[in-house]
Design a protein with these regions (language model features):
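Von Willebrand factor
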Residues: 1-57, 62-104, 108-111, 132-143
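Mature extracellular/periplasmic domains of secretome proteins
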Residues: 117-125
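Loop/turn elements at helix/coil->beta-strand transitions in domains of secreted/extracellular proteins
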Residues: 36-38, 97, 126-130
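Conserved ATPase-coupling elements of RecA-like P-loop NTPase cores
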Residues: 17-19, 112-115
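C-terminal helix of von Willebrand factor
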Residues: 79-85, 142-172
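Acidic, Ser/Thr-rich peripheral helices and adjacent loops at domain boundaries
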Residues: 54-70, 149-159
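A generic secondary-structure signal
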Residues: 28-32, 86-93, 121
Length: 172
């Protein structure tokens, strides 16, 4: 298993329960990365150029660093392109070339075709996957925005059954 890059939607539409689910999944993935001594990058994103990156290298961060990351909430609109480009930058320049990407969002956006094609080219070069976690609040058919670029999509409204186990096991 390689490192993990987690793109977390912190747009205004995720405020409340969806944001709590997103943070819970993110912090669980961080713990899994820590247990197996893998690096973890958290890309907080919202609209426009709003993006913040927290990098957690094994043994190089504190509980305070984790708390600060978990308390961050950007607010605003949603832009999928910015976090995808940031994930690709981390692969190119920060030693995350063997990382898989987890994309957590409520799905209220779409990835432009040019960016999707760039992502597909990078996937062919680096052999990574993108897993989507949809903060769906029980709404039907909200995975349309993740289908074009995510290999597998988990929905928070179904994480109470065995799907949560398969999600966690996929990154152990």
């Amino acid at each position: 298993m390689g490192d993990i890059i987690c793109c977390l939607d912190e747009s205004g539409s995720t405020e409340g329960e969806a944001a709590a689910w997103g943070k819970a999944v993110t912090m669980t993935l961080l713990e899994i990365a820590a247990e197996s001594r893998r690096s973890f990058a958290l890309i907080h994103f919202a609209g426009g150029s709003s993006c913040q990156v927290d990098i957690f290298r094994p043994g190089e961060y504190t509980l305070e660093d984790k708390l600060t990351a978990s308390e961050t909430f950007l607010g605003g609109g949603t832009n999928f392109e910015r976090p995808i480009r940031e994930a690709l930058r981390l692969m190119d320049t920060e030693g995350f070339e063997k990382a898989d990407v987890v994309f957590i969002t409520d799905g209220e956006c779409e990835l432009p075709d040019a960016c999707r094609q760039e992502l597909q080219a990078a996937q062919a070069a680096y052999h990574f996957t993108v897993t989507g976690i949809l903060l769906d609040k029980g709404q039907a058919d909200t995975d349309f925005s993740l289908k074009p670029f995510c290999r597998k999509i988990y929905q928070t409204n179904s994480l109470f059954d065995t799907n949560i186990t398969s999600l966690i096991d996929a990154y152990r």
